[in-house]
Regions:
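Short microdomains enriched in Cys/His and/or Lys/Arg
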Residues: 26-58, 115-129, 143-159, 308, ...
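Iron-sulfur cluster-binding cysteine motifs and their immediate structural context
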Residues: 8, 21, 25-37, 69, ...
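Non-ligating segments of multi-cofactor redox enzymes
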Residues: 9, 44, 48-76, 155-156, ...
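Residues that cap or flank secondary-structure elements
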Residues: 15, 80, 90, 118, ...
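Intrinsically disordered, low-complexity polar segments enriched in Ser/Thr/Pro and acidic
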Residues: 49-55, 101, 105-111, 423
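Iron-sulfur-associated redox domains of electron-transfer enzymes in respiratory
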Residues: 137-506
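Short, charged low-complexity linear segments at domain edges
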Residues: 1-13, 64-84, 93-111, 254-260, ...
Length: 506
């Protein structure tokens, strides 16, 4: 398998041979604009040549605009009210990379003249592909630090799985290296009162999602069941495919569940006034900022990995020099299955592990835990899993352009369970991750994914249903998955937002 890079926009394609009629999905350049990359890790010259050509063209446009005011505005529209991302106008060179990414990679299309307002999933892929750093997450880290400094609130952080294998990149560590112990130490140094693992929330999601799936399977509910932990995908479904909303799992995302449990259960156990609690989710994902504002009221702040890197440097905390600390108890650690939520296919693997236990009353053996067909970076992955008298067909989709392939001609209907992630590689490729050379993105995603699988392999507890703290939560408070208490705190509903495409008011 060879890698080719587009000299105009930096898009990378992996194929045995580039066909003569190949067209770049980003900038629509032909085959002649691609060059073969001979080294595994792209060198600086590769990146410089791409950026130089993009910048040179953009500067020519800027210069011509002084004379001609009718020059095309190539950048993607970002509303001033966008909760996830913002543009720094002074850095923008109108190269069009953001718009190409949004249209060709994220697969968003709409008529702005009709819509009146831009439609954004908040995924932040434009951030990763901007050559000048003109688009950034909407920062909240200064607000969080200000709250901590008042000493009036109980501030609680949760570390998402994908963050622990990326944070070291800004501190001289290798992509994929597990920094979770050092992150706990760093967050306590900053002043957080409690630090939890979002993998606990992922385990909770698994318990509820598997119970929901089993109920649909036995009661002939709407099938297939789609996952709902990626907020960018959820919004895409609401806007572009409202016909699928009955098929979406009603489960909140892991941080949505965990924040609800913190304010309802943890507060009582620790005798803390819920109004005094401030929850801060540390995520690889800018779209989680949108989720916090539009979908889940219990998430107070979402701080991306890239933001946390800035905060640590401002506080002169060198992550690579810190000792490891443990998560706080009660809602602390998660299983290995919860950790691999950060990879494309990880949710499905975790679901299979627990569904197998429910349907057969036995755990999968250690050598049965890895589902190779569901791993890797193919746009659509599928497998058939046999349990008792069922042959369950599952599919894993990364990037929404691939989802459209699955939806064509009702092809998706042959599956029982479909996982969808907006970003390539899943959460490890999120728009809030530390920046790197555009041409090295794929290599770094692979290293991060490997890091999460390594953590899972080393965990003593690898099944969500074997998480002891989770068992206590159900015993003492929730009773069982899909209980009245669970539905109240852990489940949600969706609404048809296709009116946005028509420029209509709700």
């Amino acid at each position: 398998m060879a890698k080719y890079i587009c000299a105009k926009c930096g898009y990378i394609v992996e194929t045995d041979k580039l066909s003569d009629d190949y067209v770049c999905p980003m900038c629509e350049s032909g085959n002649d604009e691609f060059k073969l990359v001979t080294n595994d890790i792209f060198d600086q010259d590769d990146l410089d040549s791409v950026i130089d050509s993009v910048v040179e063209e953009a500067l020519e446009i800027k210069t011509s605009k002084i004379v001609n005011d009718t020059v095309e505005d190539k950048k993607v529209r970002i509303s001033q009210y966008n909760p996830a991302i913002v543009r720094i106008p002074e850095k923008c060179i109108n190269c069009g990379q953001c718009k190409k990414t949004c249209e060709k990679v994220v697969n968003l299309s709409y008529d702005l003249n009709v819509c009146k307002n831009p439609i954004c999933l908040g995924c932040g892929q434009c951030i990763l592909n901007c050559p000048t750093g003109a688009i950034v997450p909407r920062y909240c880290y200064k607000d969080v630090k200000g709250i901590i400094n008042t000493n009036e609130k109980v501030v609680i952080a949760m570390i998402a799985p994908a963050v622990r294998v990326s944070m070291g990149e800004n501190f001289g560590m290798d992509p994929g290296e597990n920094t979770e112990g050092k992150l706990v130490t760093a967050l306590k140094k900053i002043g957080f009162d409690y630090v939890f693992d979002t993998a606990f929330g992922a385990d909770l999601t698994i318990m509820e999602e598997v119970a929901e799936f089993a109920a649909r399977l036995t009661n002939k509910g709407p099938m297939p069941q789609f996952t709902s932990c990626c907020p960018a995908w959820v919004k895409y479904a609401e806007v572009y495919h409202p016909e699928l909303l009955d098929n979406l799992s009603t489960c909140k995302s892991p941080i949505g569940m965990q924040c609800a449990i913190i304010k309802e259960y943890f507060s009582k156990e620790k005798n803390i006034d819920p109004s005094k609690i401030v929850t801060v989710a540390i995520t690889p994902c800018t779209s989680k900022k949108m989720e916090a504002r539009e979908y889940t009221i219990n998430i107070d702040y979402v701080m991306t990995a890239s933001e946390l890197s800035i905060l640590l440097k401002e506080e002169d905390i060198k992550l690579n020099n810190l000792n490891d600390s443990e998560y706080d108890k009660l809602l602390g650690e998660g299983s290995g299955g919860g950790v691999i939520f950060g990879n494309s296919g990880g949710v499905t693997e975790s679901v299979i592990r627990t569904l197998y236990r429910i349907m057969t009353r036995t755990n999968l053996k250690k050598d049965q835990l890895v589902f190779t067909d569901l791993r890797g970076f193919n746009g659509i992955k599928e497998a058939t899993i046999e349990m008792n008298n069922y042959k369950l067909k599952v599919a894993v989709v990364q990037q929404l352009e691939n989802l459209e392939e699955l939806l064509k001609d009702g092809r998706y209907k042959k599956y029982h369970f479909i996982e969808v992630m907006n970003c390539k590689g899943g959460c490890i490729g999120g728009g809030g991750q530390p920046l790197c050379q555009i041409t090295q993105l794929d290599k770094i995603r692979e290293q991060r994914a490997k890091g999460l699988y390594n953590i899972d392999n080393k965990r003593t507890v690898r099944f969500a249903h074997d998480n002891q703290e989770l068992k206590l939560l159900y015993k003492n408070y929730l009773r069982k998955p899909l209980s009245e208490e669970s539905f109240k705190l852990l489940h949600t509903s969706y609404s048809d937002k296709s009116y946005l495409l028509r420029g209509e008011e709700k």
